[in-house]
Amino acid sequence: MPKREDIKRILVIGSGPITIGQAAEFDYSGTQALKALKSAGYEVIIVNSNSATIMTDPEFSDAVYIEPLTVEFLEKIIEKERPDALLPTLGGQTALNLAVELAERGILDKYGVQLIGAKLESIKKAEDRELFKETMEKAGLEVLRSRLVNNLADALETAREFGYPVIIRPSFTLGGTGGGIAFNEEELRDIVTKGLIESPVHTVLIEESVLGWKEYELEVVRDGAGNFIVVCSIENLDPMGIHTGDSITVAPAQTLTDVEYQRMRDAAYKVIDAIGIETGGSNIQFALDPETGRMVVIEMNPRVSRSSALASKATGYPIAKVAALLAVGFTLDEIPNYITGKTMAAFEPSIDYVVVKIPRFQLEKFPGADPRLNTQMKSVGEVMAIGRTFKEALGKALRSLELDAAPKLDLEHIREHLANPTPERISYVFAAFRNGMDVEEVHELTKIDRWFLREMKACIELEEELKLKKFDVEILKKAKQWGYSDREIAEIWGVSEKEIRKMREDNRIFPVYKMVDTCAAEFEAQTPYYYSTYNGVENEAVPSDREKIMILGSGPNRIGQGIEFDYTNVHGVWSFQEEGYETIMVNSNPETVSTDYDTSDRLYFEPLTVEDVLEIVRNEKPKGVVVAFGGQTPLKIAKYLVEERVNIIGTSFESIEIAEDREKFAKLLKQIGLKCPPFGTASSVEEALRVAENLGYPVLVRPSYVLGGRAMAIVDTPQELEMYVKEAAVVSPGYPVLIDKFLEDAIELDVDVVSDGKYVWIAGLMEQIEEAGVHSGDSACVLPPVSLSEKLVEEIEETVYKLVKALKVVGVANIQLAVKDEEIYIIEANPRASRTVPFVSKAIGIPVARIAAKIMVGRNLPELLSEYFPYPTRPGVKVDKLGESEILPTPWPKMFSVKEVVIPFHKFPGTDVLLGPEMRSTGEVMGIGEDFAEAFAKAQIAAGNPLPTTGAILATVADKDKREAVPLLAHLADMGFEIYATRGTAKALQSHGVEVKVVPKVGEGRPDVIDLLEQGKISLVVITQSSDEPALVAVSHGKEPFKVEGRRTVGYMIRTTALKRKIPYLTTVESLRAAVAAIRKMKKGSIVKVRRLTDTWKM
């Protein structure tokens, strides 16, 4: 069937901010689909609230909307753009839920929009647990015994009938949010109560437990003519009971017999058929009882998912692209296989290698959270590695995780840790074998298949052999074939990594590169996509004779280093291509656009370690390597690359070192006459106490060389300081801790700046909305700034100019400043792309990363900017021609843009929601408005914390904040809000003539503040931290397993209750001030105004 001619315009919904369970894979699949639809001749409209995405770049669609993903905003866009069809299968759970709501409210019918890619009843059959169960039973497929309940009593009754443990799954939630496993009645009460709140339809499914069964997934594709293929089988190394997003997975499945695989394949076809998926990709999960062979269908996703991104990268088969084309009427035998260029998409991929995916966790960011893995997803990113054998792929994947140090294991409790999996699970399996446990014993505790355990035990046996045969060439070869890195072998032999590298070179032990070609080398591949192996002879990655630039990616997503860096990398690749270079991408993250087969000229899917990068350099001999676009990951290895005489493109490594080393940096600032907050460094507790005494408390403590503020804190007392220094010493041994005077009540600014060595251009001047001391990655910010005088902006431009010239920046850099009493202080400078580059590019309409990349290969800045000139500048600044001054004019858009962050607190009940200098957000949204108030209000809606316009407010404000907070609360009372407050706050309000209802604090009588919140009477909580309330320490102190921090203050109880009840909360005076302005704006009239992104640049 050829493509459909009855539709011309297609609306695609993106997945919004990155959260746990919904990450960069949707930008990758969305970008792929947009390219496919445009090339098939359709007009495409994209809506997404996340500016850090390639899919919201204007060149991929006919109209881009960066607006909140709510039905109200979508209806406005549909009314304005009049699409013929809506494709909801590319934006994860978010887009599916919105499509269902748009259909059920009659909005799609009203504007004549048809759903393509998945029918409404199919989405419901797949997503509604009860309907899914009925549908499967009708099709003759076995599912787990389960019952849907909407209250606690029925849940308890069901659990008694099924017997504990039972699994609880809330309906229509993402990444298992609100679910869990209950082993007894007490746990059931707790999980069901939470689950009923989390589920948008307030129902949960109680399901019989299949803990310990094996879990498999099939990625399948079907077209309108009934053709059906399995793209990839994926086996979860971890058994059922751990969310598949938190499991180590292997493709293709290793322990299925052929008979079992055929049975599963047939079942998958029946599932798709019964649900009614006529076109597109789906992911189907099965559980298999290894004892009896009983197989049940667990669930299916009628959309592109995290697993389909993995399957695409593992096989080279672009599921999202194919699914988009199937949705508009093509069939599989009409779509080419883009990798071979010769076969069709109807061919099932076959692969002659093994792929391992391992999740990346960051539970240390959420003290008090339960580290045990269960059906609720907790990981923030993942890595993928390819090898010829399972051992080789596993070894490569483990080193791709970039875990700086081996996890501290609690060897006395190995058995307990094997039975209760945590993120360190795999380390405990290896530790068990090192301590003499056998495969049977470990299998009993973990239920990991014996085949995998035997493979892992063999690795430990090899380590023993290595110890016995030091410097033996044959054993070195074997270790390399089994996936061991030079560094690991060096540790076993007690020598340096360099010595092992030399030994390999002397004996000509090098990896060869093999191709990912979808067809096990049966046809010639057109798009070069490679992995390394020591299990091969022929090198398939034959370099061309073109000039090459190699770009290092940012590895697995994590807090502090997310999709924003991938965005910059991809823009870099395109720019270098436009300048005539061949581009080589190196990365290990399967979720990203950078690892798409058609982004760069050559893709190496490899770990970002010194060893792996040097081997690729040896093979490709690039003109230079780019380390400035991938966040901290490439910077960490830059030093070693320079030692091996690899050319670094852009800002020199010397400048990077000066900026990272506080002593050198302070010296440089002094030379050029700029200020930084007074500071000292300390290598011991005594020294730290001395330094802090001299500076005066509060002080900011942090280790050197770190991203995302790991182990950083604001400290008010010597006792707290002592605790922290002990902690930070663990983070970077051999590097001293830095202690800064903390500037209270300063305005913090974030500057993204570009320079070609002569000219300096501030691309984005952003003002942080949260007070100084909140990590800039966790603070909302606004562009252009709202509280700077003209004189101050000029001084900032001068300051930045001096610093950028002194650091000899070539390309892009990020500078953080604080302004206190009209004085400018430099907090830090990073001579690399920062996480705000995509936001700035979208706010000003100029692609910052692309310009920076071109400068790195010698282009001139004014000439590159002239393409976008004239752009809006500050009122009163007139510029006729670029380049008259070395300071180029700072863009000053007419529209205001607010970046707001999304923090996954609800995934970690037990963690306090106060913000501090340690970064904890996973993603971001952007709100655009005519003034700051509108932009802030839209950003709050987009981040899922919509501000109320009516109702009651609960206020409890610290003494130091009362002077500023009281008039703001009085404003809210004038706007008709009822105000409830605790004693001290109520007194301050009453003295200003504000009517208040006094509420007792916890322990002062009932009903107290917590009761009030639990009754659902409150629509907004304002609570700022008082100085007598210590912040929860942001790190866990290697306690016995599963113990929770003991400091539970009243403030903590209020904040966590608000979070649990989904009541919006404000924890700083700054955010309260912004919220008051936004609420006033919302009361005056609708803020549901939508504008094309490109129109916001023309205002």
Curated annotation (Swiss-Prot):
Protein name as annotated: Carbamoyl phosphate synthase large chain
Membrane-spanning ranges: none
MGS-like domain segment(s): 945-1099
Binding-site list for Mg(2+) 4: E828, N830
Free-text cofactor note: Binds 4 Mg(2+) or Mn(2+) ions per subunit.
Location of region: Carboxyphosphate synthetic domain: 1-402
Gene: carB
Annotated ATP 2 binding sites: R702, K741, L743, E748, G773, V774, H775, S776, Q816, E828
UniProt organism field: Thermotoga maritima (strain ATCC 43589 / DSM 3109 / JCM 10099 / NBRC 100826 / MSB8)
Record key words, sorted: Amino-acid biosynthesis, Arginine biosynthesis, ATP-binding, Ligase, Magnesium, Manganese, Metal-binding, Nucleotide-binding, Pyrimidine biosynthesis, Repeat
Binding site for Mn(2+) 2: E299, N301
The protein's annotated pathway: Amino-acid biosynthesis; L-arginine biosynthesis; carbamoyl phosphate from bicarbonate: step 1/1; Pyrimidine metabolism; UMP biosynthesis via de novo pathway; (S)-dihydroorotate from bicarbonate: step 1/3
EC number: 6.3.4.16, 6.3.5.5
Region Allosteric domain, annotated ranges: 945-1099
Cofactor: Mg(2+); Mn(2+)
Residues bound to Mn(2+) 1: Q285, E299
